């Protein structure tokens, strides 16, 4: 039991380290990436962690993802930083919005919870693919809905639709990446974990 808990903590720490490295790498790539689609990869450790370690640890990984999003949006100013940090002014205003905290944390925490339960329905590669799809879609749907609900009137609907289109385009790429990598990684990690 103690060995299993220690192993889970070690795996959790590895996932967090991967998330930090991926975020740093992504920030570099975004600056030189010539295409408008800039998908995130931070959902992958959260989804895979949820499947492998359970929904509680998945929720914790989602919280870490939210914290990374919040800190990055607070430090690195981009046109969409206000969506994830109340310390960045909303476009067209001189103040931030507390809803940035909601968008930064709640969708990400739920991405850490839902894949575990989806995977339990079909405990195989198909289940891993469905869990990856569900986790990625959860983030996309909640972020888009939040943009429209919390910022639609402030941004005027045309700008919120533009932001929505950007997020939706990114999410298609994110879903494809998540499904491919999760279906490849989860069986290998599950086997390695069961053998240890």
Swiss-Prot record:
Its main location: membrane. One of its GO terms (molecular function) is transmembrane transporter activity. GO terms for cellular component: plasma membrane. InterPro entries: ECF_trnsprt_substrate-spec. It is found in: Cell membrane. It comes from the Bacteria. Keywords: Cell membrane, Membrane, Transmembrane, Transmembrane helix, Transport. The chain crosses the membrane at residues 10-30, 35-55, 58-78, 99-119, 131-151, 161-181. Gene3D superfamilies: 1.10.1760.20. It is a multi-pass membrane protein. Probably a pantothenic acid-binding protein that interacts with the energy-coupling factor (ECF) ABC-transporter complex. Unlike classic ABC transporters this ECF transporter provides the energy necessary to transport a number of different substrates. The substrates themselves are bound by transmembrane, not extracytoplasmic soluble proteins. In E.coli forms a stable energy-coupling factor (ECF) transporter complex composed of 2 membrane-embedded substrate-binding protein (S component), 2 ATP-binding proteins (A and A' components) and 2 transmembrane proteins (T component), probably with a stoichiometry of 2:1:1:2. May be able to interact with more than 1 S component at a time. This is Pantothenic acid transporter PanT.
């Amino acid at each position: 039991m103690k060995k299993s808990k220690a192993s889970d903590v070690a795996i959790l720490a590895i996932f967090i380290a991967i998330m930090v490295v991926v975020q740093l790498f992504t920030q570099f790539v975004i600056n030189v990436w010539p295409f408008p689609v800039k998908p995130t990869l931070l959902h992958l450790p959260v989804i895979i962690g949820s499947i492998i370690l359970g929904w509680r640890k998945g929720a914790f990984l989602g919280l870490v993802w939210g914290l990374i999003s919040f800190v990055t949006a607070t430090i690195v100013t981009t046109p969409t930083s206000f969506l994830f940090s109340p310390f960045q002014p909303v476009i067209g205003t001189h103040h931030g919005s507390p809803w940035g905290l909601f968008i930064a944390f709640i969708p990400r925490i739920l991405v850490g919870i839902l894949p575990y339960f989806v995977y339990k329905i079909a405990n195989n590669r198909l289940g891993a693919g469905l869990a990856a799809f569900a986790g990625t879609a959860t983030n996309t749907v909640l972020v888009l809905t939040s943009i429209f609900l919390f910022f639609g009137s402030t941004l005027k609907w045309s700008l919120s639709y533009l932001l929505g289109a950007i997020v939706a385009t990114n999410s298609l790429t994110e879903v494809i990446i998540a499904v491919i990598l999760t279906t490849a990684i989860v069986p290998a990690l599950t086997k390695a974990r069961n053998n240890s």
